[in-house]
Amino acid sequence: MQNNEEPYSKTRNSGQHPSGVHTKKSPRLPKCARCRNHGYASPLKGHKRYCMWRDCQCKKCSLIAERQRVMAAQVALRRQQAQEEELGISHPIHLPIAAELLIKKEHGGSSSCLMLENSSTQTTSTPTSGSTASSEGKVLIQEIPSITSRGHMESTSDLVMDSPYYSNFYQPPLYPYYNNLYNYPPYQMAMAAESTSGNDMGGISGPPLKNNHRNHPAAYVPSQSGNQWQMKNRENRFPGHSGSSQFRMHSYYPPYLGQSVPNPACVPPFLTFEEIPSYSEAKASVLSPPSSQDSGVISLSSNSPVSNESTKAVAEQEPNSESSLFTVTTAAENGE
């Protein structure tokens, strides 16, 4: 080895200049390490392909190759960490451990038991180095928000039971007082309601007139669209209006139908003006007392003399219902 180093030392000494002669140092040029190990000094630039000891397997050259592999691995690791920091991913090495813990949580009974199991496994496991201990601490930090964020992880059946409530939130089964979303007949836009006897009578006649105007269904409200009033019997009653008058609610009509704008062209009359009895008979049948069990279909067209103004006048007489009924019945008897 001494003989090999001699020419290298000679070339090195020959390249030096006396201190008093040169005023500026020459730039340092990297030399080939493999050639240096074998006693030759050759510049590294453009020499890698043509190096004579490129495939040398001696001890020094093998150490050089191992060092190059380690440095390449470190560079690749630094690039990977930089990319993960840009993407917001932290600790990629511990992801399989976190996935196993999540699988244990899903198959376990409750979150408290899972926390105890995880803590027991981590206390029993002896860390071999400081890096493993720090990784376990990081996994513990990642477990806590995962358990709190999941909320009801104790039983997944609760989530399955809650899903139909949110999916069928506006469906008819949740609202027993409504037949459909708008609650109007599909073929005729006449305002419909039932005519029953006793306390089931929800119309404008009888003792329910003493209650507030909110108890009247939308079939008897004169401000709705059209002048036709339709009364259905018990066989054709709607399922949404089967309750008593105090539990009934208004039927909803969409705003595009209009409120107080009659449209006789779109709503065909149920009966003609000739088929309807006289004015007094129609008024007596509409304002009949609750004791009379008049069932059937009575529809007043837009050409009938009973207009919205007369119905509004009748609706305004709610405080004096008994006196108004008495005067109406006497007027009907005098007319007959």
Swiss-Prot record:
One of its GO terms (cellular component) is nucleus. InterPro entries: DM_DNA-bd (IPR001275), DM_DNA-bd_sf (IPR036407), DMRT (IPR026607), DMRT1-like (IPR022114). Its main location: nucleus. Signal peptide: none annotated. Disulfide bonds: none annotated. Keywords: Activator, Developmental protein, Differentiation, DNA-binding, Metal-binding, Nucleus, Repressor, Sexual differentiation, Transcription, Transcription regulation, Zinc. It comes from the Eukaryota. It is found in: Nucleus. It holds the Pfam family Dmrt1. PANTHER family: DOUBLESEX AND MAB-3 RELATED TRANSCRIPTION FACTOR DMRT, DOUBLESEX- AND MAB-3-RELATED TRANSCRIPTION FACTOR 1. This is Doublesex- and mab-3-related transcription factor 1A. It comes from Xenopus laevis.
